[in-house]
Amino acid sequence: MIEKVYQVKLKVYGPVHIGSGKIIRKQEYIYDRRKSLAHIVDGPNLVKFLNKKGKFTAYLQYLNTTKERADLYTFLRQEQIDTNDWKTFVLYTERVNQGKIDMKDHNPYSRTSTNRRQVDKGMNDLHLFVRDGRGDLYIPGSSLKGALRTVLEGANQSAEAFHSLSISDSLPIDPKNLAIYQKIDINKELKPMPLYRECVNVGTTVEFTMKINSDDWTIEKIEKQIQQAYLQYWNKWFVGMVTTPGGKAFIKGGGLPSVLHAKHRPTVLFLGGGTGFPSKTTHYLQKPKEQAQKDIFAILQRRFRNVYGKMATVPKNVPMVLKGTVNDSTNKWYQQGVCLLEFQPIGEA
């Protein structure tokens, strides 16, 4: 058996979140709303700094008084702690992208628009991106392999096909390619949700090494299955979602770059958290559209009784929400976790 080796280039077209499982509260980071920046804090160094300045007791009192409303930025400003001193306890800084939505017109607000309602809101808990033992950002090979597994299972490929693949962890990701994005549900309207994630930013290319240990399984077959899975996703679900009022605004905001259009048969793969039920399961890959809708609806009725449980009939689109987000500095919209894959042969082992 000849082992075939490939370089995998994952090009990010929608923010990718691979969660570390760690969530920090707004008392544990500094959110500068005016500049749309979040400064992630080293807790021990913050305590050391506050003790040195004689402010630690005041901070505890502030937390006790304000409770859930407490945020570190407000406390530092109240205590007149200069921003130049923040470097003592700030680990790194990221841009924050919040959804600022015109609910009447179902359009993103332009930051330069004269009729834009001024949105001055804080952040909630922040879901952090995975890092290795050295603190470097990376995407585990298991995350990419898991996404490929869904595609292969959807095409009814044997377990042998999946087990013949081995994928390395990615090369380290430059911290400058990390940003915070807010979850936005897209259907009848564009609905920002109180969920914030650290994500690999759009425009980043992440590299892996993949090996195929099979004489029968080829990179051409894998590419074909990825393309076919995206076509099923597109025809059976996505085209319906983008005809909703929110979906139309999403498209108008640049949510579907030409390179991702199904007519080009792109090797699109959805990766990471928040990409949505259709891309995480095989229902639309294996079943006729009507049957997939019925089966998904039955599952969602059990999981979300307050929404789907109240419905007597299967809605036109199931699930009813497209998972998206927006870069509020450019007003460009994205599907969460949408990526393009490229495979380049390295050699044979």
Curated annotation (Swiss-Prot):
InterPro entries reported in the protein's UniProt record: CRISPR-assoc_Csm5, RAMP_III_fam
Natural source organism: Enterococcus italicus (strain DSM 15952 / CCUG 50447 / LMG 22039 / TP 1.5)
Disulphide linkage map: none
Keyword RNA-binding: yes
GO molecular function per UniProt: RNA binding
Keywords noted in UniProt: Antiviral defense, RNA-binding
Highest taxon in the source lineage: Bacteria
Gene Ontology terms describing biological process: defense response to virus
Name of the protein in question: CRISPR system Cms protein Csm5
Protein family according to the UniProt entry: Belongs to the CRISPR-associated Csm5 family.
Role played: CRISPR (clustered regularly interspaced short palindromic repeat) is an adaptive immune system that provides protection against mobile genetic elements (viruses, transposable elements and conjugative plasmids). CRISPR clusters contain spacers, sequences complementary to antecedent mobile elements, and target invading nucleic acids. CRISPR clusters are transcribed and processed into CRISPR RNA (crRNA). This subunit might be involved in maturation of a crRNA intermediate to its mature form.
Pfam family, one: RAMPs
Misc. comment: Encoded in a type III-A CRISPR locus.
SUBUNIT field: Part of the Csm effector complex that includes Cas10, Csm2, Csm3, Csm4 and Csm5.
Name of the coding gene: csm5
